[in-house]
A protein has these predicted regions:
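AMP-binding/adenylate-forming core of the ANL superfamily
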Residues: 1-4
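Single, functionally critical "micro-switch" positions that shape active/binding sites
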Residues: 7
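Catalytic phosphate-donor-binding core of small-molecule kinases
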Residues: 10-112
């Protein structure tokens, strides 16, 4: 699964079929990666939620947890990873008028 903030919702999560979260949303989206079912929608959770992602019984495959494409950390069958939003905030610099949806529209149009 992909766990993304509003900023991350326009990247890998969007490519996996997840929704775009408004930049003012206080929460995260959890998007399945390549689900075997069409009935596996992304889910949005409030910022106060602590999410426990549990690794089931794994056959020959390994499960990794990674942050923003960094090197992964292996998780064993039965392991649980707790995911929650930090109280710390990162301020992003934008030049000119920042319009999240105009920027997304330009990104999507350039990929056609």
């Amino acid at each position: 699964v992909i766990v993304a903030t509003p900023t991350g919702s326009t990247a890998y999560s969007l490519a996996a079929g997840g929704p775009i979260l408004d930049s003012q949303t206080k929460g995260v989206v959890v998007t399945p990666i390549c689900p075997h079912s069409l009935a596996s929608p992304a889910m949005v959770f409030a910022q106060e939620r602590k999410l426990n992602i549990c690794v089931g019984q794994v056959a020959d495959d390994e499960v990794f947890i990674s942050c923003d494409g960094a090197a992964g950390y292996p998780l064993k069958a039965g392991a649980t990873a707790e995911v929650r939003l930090s109280d710390q905030v990162v301020k992003l610099i934008t030049f000119g008028k920042a319009d999240q949806f105009q920027a997304i529209d330009q990104k999507l149009r350039s990929r056609r």
